[in-house]
Amino acid sequence: MYRLAKIISNAGVCSRRNAEKLIVGGKVKIDGITILSPATNVDISNQIEVSGRLINNIQKPRLWIYYKPIGLITTHKDPLSRKTVFEQLIGLPRVISIGRLDLNSEGLLLLTNSGDLAHQFEMPSSKLKRVYNVRAYGNANFLLKNNYNNLKIDGIFYNPYSIKLLRQNKNNSWFEVVLFEGKNREIRRIFEYFGLKVNKLIRVQYGALKIGNLKPGDYKEISNKILKKIISNKLTNYIDNR
């Protein structure tokens, strides 16, 4: 038997918390009967309906690495009718993203059919490393020589783990930035605070997973064997260049 909210979350419909709200709001039926308790147990024989749509009630967690191109937003629906990540994912089941990349950022975006798996990756206690390659215009020395930890910008504290200069030329510098908790536009705001303008931002690693040889718009599924190792924290570094 499985908790109803967990099944809805694992089906990729929404997070477990939002699944509980849908249930309490009378949006969920089991075998045609409206259910109001998120703690309700179901099994593989039950037919589950969410807002009028049937879902597969039991499915294994799956995980994909996707190279998000610039110009797409990480949402299922956009009120401004901009192009979204999920409109481009032909051939995948319904998935949700683990975290986000903003419109003008690119690189590694994790996708899953499991709200529980997404929650495991996203919660701060997971302490999963996010690595970015960042190109910026401005004086790199001012950033590197100052203390960029525990910065307070517009009332929000930012605490990047490390910022390392990779290379520079007359106009731009490339940096490697490591975060363990990503806040909205964190890197861009930190760099702007120190007088640098970010003009390219690529996420190349999330936890043990690296972007490898993927090109913008490409995706690949992580094998069940590797996924189990990631979930059990036995895999600290993985790159698949198939």
Swiss-Prot record:
<dbReference type="InterPro" id="IPR002942">
    <property type="entry name" value="S4_RNA-bd"/>
</dbReference>
<protein>
    <recommendedName>
        <fullName>Uncharacterized RNA pseudouridine synthase RT0532</fullName>
        <ecNumber>5.4.99.-</ecNumber>
    </recommendedName>
</protein>
<dbReference type="InterPro" id="IPR036986">
    <property type="entry name" value="S4_RNA-bd_sf"/>
</dbReference>
<dbReference type="Pfam" id="PF01479">
    <property type="entry name" value="S4"/>
</dbReference>
<dbReference type="GO" id="GO:0120159">
    <property type="term" value="F:rRNA pseudouridine synthase activity"/>
</dbReference>
<keyword id="KW-0413">Isomerase</keyword>
<feature type="domain" description="S4 RNA-binding">
    <location>
        <begin position="2"/>
        <end position="69"/>
    </location>
</feature>
<dbReference type="Pfam" id="PF00849">
    <property type="entry name" value="PseudoU_synth_2"/>
</dbReference>
<dbReference type="InterPro" id="IPR000748">
    <property type="entry name" value="PsdUridine_synth_RsuA/RluB/E/F"/>
</dbReference>
<comment type="similarity">
    <text>Belongs to the pseudouridine synthase RsuA family.</text>
</comment>
<dbReference type="InterPro" id="IPR042092">
    <property type="entry name" value="PsdUridine_s_RsuA/RluB/E/F_cat"/>
</dbReference>
<dbReference type="GO" id="GO:0003723">
    <property type="term" value="F:RNA binding"/>
</dbReference>
<dbReference type="InterPro" id="IPR050343">
    <property type="entry name" value="RsuA_PseudoU_synthase"/>
</dbReference>
<keyword id="KW-0694">RNA-binding</keyword>
<dbReference type="InterPro" id="IPR020094">
    <property type="entry name" value="TruA/RsuA/RluB/E/F_N"/>
</dbReference>
<dbReference type="InterPro" id="IPR020103">
    <property type="entry name" value="PsdUridine_synth_cat_dom_sf"/>
</dbReference>
<feature type="active site" description="Nucleophile">
    <location>
        <position position="102"/>
    </location>
</feature>
<dbReference type="InterPro" id="IPR018496">
    <property type="entry name" value="PsdUridine_synth_RsuA/RluB_CS"/>
</dbReference>
<dbReference type="GO" id="GO:0000455">
    <property type="term" value="P:enzyme-directed rRNA pseudouridine synthesis"/>
</dbReference>
<dbReference type="InterPro" id="IPR006145">
    <property type="entry name" value="PsdUridine_synth_RsuA/RluA"/>
</dbReference>
